[in-house]
UniProtKB/Swiss-Prot annotation:
Domain of life: Bacteria
Gene Ontology annotations for the cellular component aspect, listed alphabetically: plasma membrane
Record has RNA-binding as a keyword: no
Gene Ontology biological process terms from the UniProt entry: cell division; cell wall macromolecule biosynthetic process; cell wall organization; peptidoglycan biosynthetic process; regulation of cell shape
Predominant place of localization: membrane
Localization (cell): Cell inner membrane
The name this protein goes by in its record: Phospho-N-acetylmuramoyl-pentapeptide-transferase
Function: Catalyzes the initial step of the lipid cycle reactions in the biosynthesis of the cell wall peptidoglycan: transfers peptidoglycan precursor phospho-MurNAc-pentapeptide from UDP-MurNAc-pentapeptide onto the lipid carrier undecaprenyl phosphate, yielding undecaprenyl-pyrophosphoryl-MurNAc-pentapeptide, known as lipid I.
Keyword Hydrolase found: no
Record's bilayer topology term: Multi-pass membrane protein
NCBIfam families, A to Z: mraY
Length: 360
């Protein structure tokens, strides 16, 4: 929004031209989201407490989690509010990339909000029925996938980038829709499964978003893209503002979500952030890289799949409890140890993912 104002003011003073630079707006976007989160956080937490919107804790979970019962949830509203404010202020509202991301965050955030509302306000322990949750997620993801496929302006927007191979970028055609769908829905649910400990999901999300900010910047410049053998995607630089807004909002939320948490993000936060990471990966053509950098999310999801599959096929559980972070809790690991070690794994995987840009 302010891009247009700055463009007009440039007529009177060339100093306003600085707002045309993506890097400058990205920094402002991060700071805006961070400061808004820190300012609004205490107010939102107090409001959630007054409304008695507290976390529901399973009776069959780790005993250490019983103390979390009643902790304010739906804190994802803080994250989404900070991201929307930052992107609307500093993003180019003429960019399709910006509107795609706002739609993803808004639609999946609404799905998560409905689920949280049913759980904590209407006291329905099941929340939004799984079937309906999946249908709504699928509908939103397919809308995005079809839109991106039908409005693709150059071949690079529908290619698949394969890490470690600089000349392997097959044209997907209509398969793009299928890949985009599974990436967005899968990432949304993966982050949702990971969000089980204080700060466990938000920090890897911040790390992956920061990495995608760099990739989006490189993809938007022909010289860098050609050097790294990745698709050149004109206009993708606007995704940098979205990514840094996620980083700022995430760090601001972590201020209140760090152990012991004052607030949880709820499904309104985890489903929307996960879908956002998936959508960014689709937009910059780095779906495989998301699997690498978001390895913690993949690990959590695979542990649930293996646990359920093993129990149904053999009648035996592989882990003491799934997702896998609960397995380590039941083994006696203190919650902060599990969290920090998963963060360390995430740092390693994000750096490994970035290294693949050059190792080709």
């Amino acid at each position: 929004m302010l891009v247009y104002l700055a463009e007009y003011l440039t007529r009177f003073h060339t100093g306003f031209n600085v707002f045309s630079y993506v890097t400058f707006r990205a920094i402002l976007g991060l700071l805006t989201a961070l400061m808004f989160s820190l300012w609004w956080g205490p107010k939102l937490i107090e409001r959630l407490q007054l409304m008695q919107i507290g976390q529901v804790v399973r009776n069959d979970g780790p005993e250490s989690h019983f103390s979390k019962r009643g902790t304010p949830t739906m804190g994802g509203l803080l994250i989404l509010g900070a991201i929307f404010l930052s992107v609307l202020l500093w993003g180019d509202l003429g960019s399709r990339y910006v509107w795609v991301m706002l739609f993803v965050l808004g639609s999946f955030g609404m799905i998560g909000f409905i689920d949280d509302y049913r759980k904590v306000v209407r006291k329905d322990t099941k929340g939004l029925i799984a079937r309906w949750k999946y249908i709504l997620q699928s509908l939103a993801a397919l809308i995005i996938a079809f839109f991106l496929y039908t409005t693709a302006a150059n071949p690079g927007e529908t290619q698949l980038v394969v890490p470690f191979f600089k000349d392997v970028m097959p044209q997907l055609g209509a398969v793009f829709i299928v890949l985009a769908y599974f990436t967005i829905v899968g990432s949304s649910n993966a982050v949702n499964l990971t969000d089980g400990l204080d700060g466990l999901a938000i920090m890897p999300t911040v790390m992956v978003a920061a990495a995608f900010a760099l990739i989006a910047y490189l993809s938007g410049h022909a010289q860098f893209a050609n050097y790294l053998h990745i698709p050149h995607l004109p206009g993708s630089g606007e995704l940098v503002i979205v990514c840094t807004a996620i980083v700022g909002a995430g760090l601001g939320f972590l201020w209140f979500n760090t152990y012991p948490a004052q607030v949880f993000m709820g499904d309104v936060g985890s489903l929307s952030l996960g879908a956002a990471l998936g959508a960014i990966a689709v937009l910059v053509r780095q779906e495989i890289l998301l699997v690498i950098m978001g390895g913690v999310f993949v690990m959590e999801t695979v542990s649930v799949i293996l646990q359920v599959g093993s129990y149904k096929l053999r009648g035996q559980r592989i882990f003491r409890m799934a997702p896998i972070h609960h397995h380590y809790e039941l083994k006696g690991w203190p919650e902060p140890r599990v969290i920090v070690r998963f963060w360390i794994i995430s740092i390693f995987l994000v750096l490994l993912g970035l290294a693949t840009l050059k190792l080709r």
